[in-house]
């Protein structure tokens, strides 16, 4: 317990990971695969090599000759946009060891690379502060808590399912950050601790990563890169969605009920002590529980429409961070008009809200710095190459389980699901053919490994999520460890079954 309490904060952990990654660039041989991509004018393929780039005909024969098992139309329709690794093309490079100056530059470069996410988070903070000042959020939460008394468990069941479904279907990830200021007060008012909303929101979306059945950023891109249809293995992934979500809901509900019965049983209380999230969540249990007034209903309607608009825009209109940020900025201005806020008061509240999430924004940027160091040191492909050589001659059942473990390892270095797919799938896909493992099994191993490791990797959304509820890494790891062991056993059994039967 004493050791757990000594775990440093999120930013210190990330800087330590950056230092370790820089050290690895001196120990692991540098190297890379040739990368194939369609030219900007869509007239030919462009292959990047150690000595430059080569133009090749934009034909299926070109892909076949390079042993890239991807139909040509996946490139011409831009289903695959990022450069794809060419199997068998790995070559050594001179060492690109990253020194002290590179370590100091890494978080700055990471912030540059993630400025769209950072601005999204800051604008969310401003929006939530303006809305919170209206008092409608507190009154709405008090009203909902009163209406749900005795049925709080259903909040966990329904919301975990919804977040898991959103992650599995269209890849909800960064968008879920907006729900913490809304749901944390609701779960605290129900008598739970800070781990419960964290497990529901972050855990739910991460379950969606693990069991993605139609996520365009992982399942579809990975299937395309592996040369199989994303619909192959769809029934199995839907089954995994049901099983993994059911196990997680049972685990969260069991913990929540224990904490509600005895607050001292809270892992947050035992590890972190009495902590509170970085924003005001105070509600009044003794407040009148009559119907909401029309002003509050109107403000809550604007609030709900903003979130529904975001979800609808992502699913149906292809929105991403620019459009979502614009939506929340516009909603903030609309609230200012409805609340008749003076210009100075609005700006002060908006800036105050953004300041409250500034540490979260920095964590996102610094986390990207890990990838910057590995890429600048030219060892990301080397890790993939030596890992592929290691598992290449294993029997199918052992091969898929080792792939699961390897993808867990890769998640530490490659936080982007689509980036990992186009870098690894052509290489792993070629290996899978040699050991007679079907393509959908390697896609599932990729999803399972990335999903499980995403619960605890410091380079993903774990640390920003922890910062939003002010829970330590030690408390989260202690809470999530038993669940991850169950999910790992489930995923391993499913993969073995898929190649044996």
Feature-to-residue mapping (PLM):
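Core transmembrane alpha-helical segments of multi-pass membrane transporters/permeases
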Residues: 10-19, 47-138, 319-382
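Long, contiguous bundles of hydrophobic transmembrane helices that form the permeation core
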Residues: 2-11, 32-47, 235-349, 469, ...
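Membrane-core helix-loop-helix motifs of multi-pass transport proteins
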Residues: 2-13, 180-271, 290-297, 460-494
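C-terminal transmembrane helix pair
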Residues: 8, 391-501
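Hydrophobic core segments of alpha-helical transmembrane domains in multi-pass membrane transport
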Residues: 13-27, 121-129, 162-166, 208, ...
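Alpha-helical transmembrane segments of multi-pass membrane proteins
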Residues: 121, 152-167, 192-207, 233, ...
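Membrane-interfacial loop-to-helix junctions in multi-pass transporters
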Residues: 112-118, 146-158, 190-196, 354-362, ...
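Hydrophobic alpha-helical transmembrane segments of multi-pass integral membrane proteins
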Residues: 122, 151-182, 364-374, 390-430
């Amino acid at each position: 317990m004493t050791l757990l309490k000594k775990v440093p904060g999120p930013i210190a952990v990330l800087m330590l990971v950056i230092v370790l990654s820089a050290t690895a660039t001196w120990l692991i041989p540098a190297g890379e695969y040739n990368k194939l991509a369609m030219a900007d004018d869509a007239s030919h393929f462009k292959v990047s090599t150690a000595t430059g780039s080569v133009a090749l005909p934009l034909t299926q024969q070109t892909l076949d000759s390079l042993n890239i098992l991807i139909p040509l139309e996946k490139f011409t329709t831009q289903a695959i946009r990022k450069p794809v690794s060419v199997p068998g093309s790995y070559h050594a490079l001179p060492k690109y060891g990253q020194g002290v100056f590179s370590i100091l530059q890494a978080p700055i470069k990471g912030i540059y690379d993630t400025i769209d996410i950072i601005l999204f988070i800051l604008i969310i903070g401003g929006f939530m502060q303006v809305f919170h000042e209206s008092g409608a959020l507190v009154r709405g939460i008090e009203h909902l808590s009163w209406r749900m008394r005795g049925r709080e468990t259903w909040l966990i069941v329904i919301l975990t399912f919804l977040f898991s479904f959103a992650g599995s279907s269209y890849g909800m990830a960064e968008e879920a950050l907006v729900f913490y200021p809304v749901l944390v007060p609701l779960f605290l008012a129900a008598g739970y601790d800070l781990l419960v909303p964290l497990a529901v929101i972050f855990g739910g979306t991460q379950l969606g990563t693990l069991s993605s059945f139609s996520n365009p950023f992982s399942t579809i891109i990975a299937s395309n890169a592996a040369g199989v249809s994303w619909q192959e293995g769809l029934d199995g992934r839907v089954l995994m969605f049901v099983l993994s979500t059911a196990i997680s809901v049972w685990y969260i509900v069991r913990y929540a009920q224990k904490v509600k019965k005895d607050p001292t049983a809270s892992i947050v209380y035992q590890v972190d002590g009495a902590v509170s999230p970085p924003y005001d969540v105070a509600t009044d249990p003794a407040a009148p529980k009559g119907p909401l007034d029309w002003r509050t209903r109107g403000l809550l309607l604007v609030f709900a429409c903003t979130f529904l608009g975001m979800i609808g825009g992502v699913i149906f209109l292809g929105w991403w961070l620019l459009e979502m940020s614009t939506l929340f900025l516009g909603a903030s201005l609309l609230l200012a008009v409805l609340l008749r806020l003076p210009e100075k008061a609005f700006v002060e509240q908006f800036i105050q809200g953004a300041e409250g999430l500034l540490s979260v924004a920095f964590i996102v940027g610094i986390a990207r710095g890990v990838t910057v160091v590995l890429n600048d040191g030219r060892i990301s492909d080397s890790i993939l190459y030596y890992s592929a050589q290691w598992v290449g001659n294993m029997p199918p059942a052992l091969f898929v389980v080792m792939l699961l473990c390897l993808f867990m390892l890769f998640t530490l270095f490659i936080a982007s699901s689509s980036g990992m797919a186009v870098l690894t799938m052509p290489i792993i896909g070629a290996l899978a053919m040699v050991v007679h493992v079907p393509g959908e099994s390697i896609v599932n191993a990729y999803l399972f490994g990335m999903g499980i490791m995403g619960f605890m990797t410091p380079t993903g959304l774990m640390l920003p999520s922890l910062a939003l509820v002010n829970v330590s890494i030690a408390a989260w790891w202690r809470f999530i460890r038993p669940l991850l062991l169950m999910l790992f056993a489930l995923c391993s059994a499913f993969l073995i079954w898929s190649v044996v039967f």
